[in-house]
Amino acid sequence: MSHRKYEAPRHGHLGFLPRKRAASVRGRVKSFPKDDKSKPVALTSFLGYKAGMTTIVRDLDRPGSKFHKREIVEAVTVVDTPPVVVVGVVGYVETPRGLRSLTTVWAEHLSDEVKRRFYKNWYKSKKKAFTKYSAKYAQNGAEIERELARIKKYATVVRVLVHTQVRKTPLVQKKAHLAEIQLNGGSISEKVDWAREHFEKTVSVDSVFEQNEMIDAIAVTKGHGFEGVTHRWGTKKLPRKTHRGLRKVACIGAWHPAHVMWSVARAGQRGYHHRTSINHKIYRIGKGDDEGNAATNFDRTKKTINPMGGFVHYGMVNNDFVMVKGSIPGCKKRVVTLRKSLYTNTSRKAVEEVTLKWIDTASKFGKGRFQTPAEKHAFMGTLKKDL
């Protein structure tokens, strides 16, 4: 019930202003984990597509908790992660004003998937992107090797250019997502050699992350358009008899200063914001060619991660996937950037070994009661539509 109070704390967080639409649909990695040269060269993040959510059952291994050694039910998110393709390498040098790009070296051959990213209208274009650049490889590649040597000599940070294989997903989109991912581990020379060796080759998600690892999810949240101040900021509704509306802010400021302060709650855009959600535990990294990638030691049913009828508003996941605990930003089909954690998490939740007992694969459209088509056929018998 709407009512009035004489004092109240402010509504809404001012730390995420401005609440406007994100400039790009892809999550940007603004900070990478600290480099450790003693470790082998590896990527620090990965790109995937949010497929949907499901439910798992596991035994909690947390001494001291009331639920220790008891079954718990948790919600998990499935991210479709087909292998990414390495198509370039970028070298950065340290300057007094931060990192500055030294040079960029591209691979000889680029697929049409990533070339579409450089065109606004692919069908009306002449499709000549990178034709002059690829000719450098035909001339013994001397200039390419010279640029790689410059990176080895001057660069302090090495990042690779990778793009997704969107054709392997159920998405209608044909344009791949292109991103820079930092290489950590080894020396600068080893990083450049690793990037050169992986030109035009794929990198799978299991070479970047491992089970029980804590990772971050970076994405653009689900958009809700123009919203009123009550829903957007959570302000109190005014009393019932208020003139000209209840879902408003009664006083938006004093006479002077003669303008509305930036901190006053106002109506506007809600959702489609760039957000980073940290500390999601990986419960499973599944292989796309494994027909039993949703089976466990307690549930030996041969089934895939796809629920009956596929994930709602996404479809079938036929590639490698990452199952993380909880929900992550973004809607179905949205590209999600998965990044290694920026610090070593030593909490009990982080170091706990997770063993799944059961993964729900019932239909997510309605009240699904069958886990597999075979189970449905055994219970229902031959249906009229199957004749």
From Swiss-Prot:
One Pfam family, short name please?
Ribosomal_L3
- What Gene3D superfamilies does this protein map onto? 3.30.1430.10, Ribosomal protein L3, domain 3, Translation factors
Query: What biological-process GO terms show up in the record?
Result: translation
| Protein location | Cytoplasm
Name the InterPro entries for this protein.
L3_arc_euk, Ribosomal_L3_dom_3_arc_sf, Ribosomal_uL3, Ribosomal_uL3_CS, Transl_B-barrel_sf
Q: Which residues form a coiled coil?
A: none
A single Gene Ontology molecular function, please? structural constituent of ribosome
Any idea which UniProt keywords this protein has?
A: Cytoplasm, Ribonucleoprotein, Ribosomal protein
Asked if the keyword Cell membrane belongs to this entry, the reply reads: no
Write out the GO cellular component annotations.
Answer: cytosolic large ribosomal subunit; fungal biofilm matrix
Q: Which domain of life is it from?
A: Eukaryota
Write out the similarity annotation: Belongs to the universal ribosomal protein uL3 family.
Question: What protein name applies here?
Answer: Large ribosomal subunit protein uL3
Species of provenance: Candida glabrata (strain ATCC 2001 / BCRC 20586 / JCM 3761 / NBRC 0622 / NRRL Y-65 / CBS 138)
